[in-house]
From Swiss-Prot:
UniProt cross-references to InterPro entries, sorted A to Z: aa-tRNA-synth_I_cd-bd, aa-tRNA-synth_I_codon-bd_sub2, aa-tRNA-synth_I_CS, aa_tRNA-synth_I_cd-bd_sf, Glu-tRNA-ligase_bac/mito, Glu-tRNA-synth_I_codon-bd_sub1, Glu/Gln-tRNA-synth, Glu/Gln-tRNA-synth_Ib_cat-dom
Listed GO MF terms: ATP binding; glutamate-tRNA ligase activity; tRNA binding; zinc ion binding
Broad EC category: ligase
Protein name per its UniProtKB record: Glutamate--tRNA ligase
Cellular component per GO, a single term: cytosol
Organism placement in taxonomy: Bacteria, Pseudomonadati, Pseudomonadota, Gammaproteobacteria, Thiotrichales
Length: 470
């Protein structure tokens, strides 16, 4: 059975790069009918926070990236790691290193001065003398000195590293806590991971980790190192590019499936298809098709994909995601048309759920002022006669339906022998308060007959006031 995992460190937010790694691992497991595990790598006790753990859990839940096992916390497995470290020590495959931080700094500076690659020189590898006083040792793994490590990476291809290029890895800190490189190997071994999908910033650790697997008598998993996500300027993605917490995208009005659709396209493609449902991603995703080159984050593209998903998603899902934004704005959706009808009308134009909620306000809330620009352009004295006639026709309608409303507006334009725009635009401003809305007849139908007649009254008052001030 295929087994994958997502193993974030709770030392900050769950960001775009991390989510893409989680998504690729989740998709691969789903497609292969395998098992996906969430593991929290919280061994860095100084930097790990409960707030970050919660942000990871909340982000995964919002995105719908469900896991078959977990969350598993590394801090609950310290006894296991210590037993493995002791086993390596007992078998002569690990050793105490007493080099002080100052000693290591001097070593690296001397190597740089000689033009060598800075690395630990193995000075305590075969040490059997008296340990220096006052130094708490770390424990290092004895990396093989001969031979080479071959990685057949599913994304990067074959990578060959000579063991003489690798120094001896620290597997336990001076306080006895295990390091990332030890815990990740033990966890993936114990949890029988078949595929490790992670960012290519981990690729330098992989040869050392493979040697650790071999020392433990374990079969290494298959590796797939996916390239990082860059900002539009070509530098590593950071907060200024939008590498904020994934939950920020929720707050900014993105649908979770739109964000996943955008992320799956960062480094992977299927023919020339841009828009994918979750099921299509599961069916079509191929790990071997992931591009080995970095991808560029583009907010405009994300907005476009979000717009497509707003248009195509199931109306119940749209309403479920839109409702919190309506509540945030203090819009009581019980006092007005059904939110599903409003959402259906607004979904064609909105790029985000925030835009949608802003546009929906006039369906539920009356207003006393009009958008200044729209009023200046369309609520002019010349609009008074068309508005009065439309108001009269609206008041006389016995059936308040979009087609009847359309007929009334059309008839008013014909009666006055003017173009539809000279009736429609002032009417749009009158009943919505601004210059943009979906079709005026469908909008008016949802707002309601009485409200439309009353709002036209307000617009006529604004025109009167304008005439008085001119």
């Amino acid at each position: 059975m295929v087994k994958t995992r997502f193993a974030p460190s709770p030392t900050g937010y769950l960001h775009i790069g991390g989510v893409r790694t989680a998504l690729f691992s989740w998709l691969y497991a789903k497609q292969k009918k395998g098992e996906f595990t969430l593991r929290i790598e919280d061994t860095d006790l100084e930097r790990s926070t409960q707030e970050s753990v919660q942000a990871i859990l909340d982000g995964m839940a919002w995105l719908g990236l469900d896991y078959d096992k977990g969350p598993i916390y590394q801090t609950e497995r310290f006894d296991r790691y210590k037993a493995v470290i002791q086993d390596l020590m007992d078998r002569g495959l690990a050793y105490y290193c007493y080099a002080s931080p100052e000693e290591l700094d001097e070593m690296r500076e001397a190597q740089k001065a000689r033009g060598d690659k800075p690395r630990y020189d193995g000075r305590y590898r075969d040490f059997d003398g008296t340990p220096p006083e006052g130094v708490k040792p770390v424990i290092r793994f004895k990396n093989p000195e001969d031979g080479e490590v071959v990685i057949d990476d599913l994304v990067k291809g074959r990578i060959v590293v000579a063991n003489k290029e690798l120094d001896d890895l620290v597997i336990a800190r001076s306080d006895g806590t295990p390091t990332y490189n030890l815990t990740v190997v033990v966890d993936d071994w114990d949890m029988e991971m078949t595929h490790v999908i992670r960012g290519d910033d981990h690729i330098n650790n992989t040869p050392r980790q493979i040697n650790l697997y071999k020392a433990l008598g374990a079969e290494p998993p298959k590796f797939a190192h996916i390239p990082m996500v860059l900002g539009e300027d070509g530098s590593r993605l950071s907060k200024r590019h939008g590498a904020v917490s994934v939950l920020q995208y929720k707050e900014d009005g993105f649908l979770p499936e739109a964000l996943l659709n955008y992320l799956v396209r960062l480094g992977w493609s299927y023919k020339d298809q841009e828009i994918f449902t979750i099921q299509e991603m599961i069916d079509l995703f191929q790990l071997e098709s992931v591009n080995a080159s970095p991808s560029t984050f583009n907010l405009e593209k994300l907005l476009w994909i979000n717009q497509q998903h707003i248009q195509m998603t199931d109306i119940d899902n749209l309403v479920k995601n839109l409702k919190p934004f309506m509540d945030q704005k203090g819009i009581d959706t019980e006092k007005g048309p059904e939110l599903s009808h409003v959402a259906n009308l607004l979904r064609e134009r909105a790029k985000t759920l925030i835009e949608m909620a802003d546009s929906a306000a006039y369906f539920y809330q009356d207003f006393t002022e009009f958008e200044a620009g729209a009023a200046k352009k369309h609520l002019r004295p010349v609009a008074e006669e068309p508005l009065r006639l439309v108001q009269k026709k609206f008041a006389e309608l016995t059936e308040w339906k979009a087609d009847k409303i359309h007929e009334a507006v059309h008839q008013a334009a014909e009666d006055l022998e003017i173009g539809m725009g000279k009736v429609g635009m002032p009417l749009r401003v009158a009943i919505t308060g601004g210059g943009q809305s979906p079709s005026i007849d469908a909008t008016a139908e949802l707002i309601g007959q009485q409200k439309c007649v009353a709002r036209i009254d307000l617009a006529l008052q604004a025109i009167e006031a304008r005439k008085a001030n001119s």
